[in-house]
């Protein structure tokens, strides 16, 4: 299972991107922001945007956790 290694919204906020600014500037939509808040995986396009805004690689924000089924 993939999960976030960092608090995405907090890191974006530290860079000056509040959830309001993300929506207003049409960088990330409300539905994707809600997914991130709920710990759900955002879309590939949203992950691309996050990596661009944070100047990072996907591996910096995501990690794989093995779950026994």
Q: Where do the model's predicted regions map?
A:
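Short, charged recognition helix plus adjacent turn
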Residues: 2-3, 11, 27, 35, ...
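Alpha-helical residues within the helix-turn-helix
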Residues: 13, 24, 52
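Short alpha-helical DNA-recognition segment
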Residues: 16-35
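Residues that mark the N-terminal boundary/hinge immediately upstream of a DNA-recognition element
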Residues: 18, 43-46, 57
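Short, basic-rich loop-to-helix N-cap that marks the start of a DNA-contacting helix
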Residues: 39-52
């Amino acid at each position: 299972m993939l999960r976030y290694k960092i608090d995405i919204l907090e890191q974006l906020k530290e860079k000056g991107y509040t959830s309001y600014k993300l929506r207003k500037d049409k960088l990330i939509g409300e539905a994707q922001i809600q997914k991130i808040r709920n710990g759900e995986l955002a879309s590939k396009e949203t992950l691309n945007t996050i990596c661009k805004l944070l100047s990072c690689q996907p591996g910096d924000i995501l990690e794989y956790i093995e779950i026994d089924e």
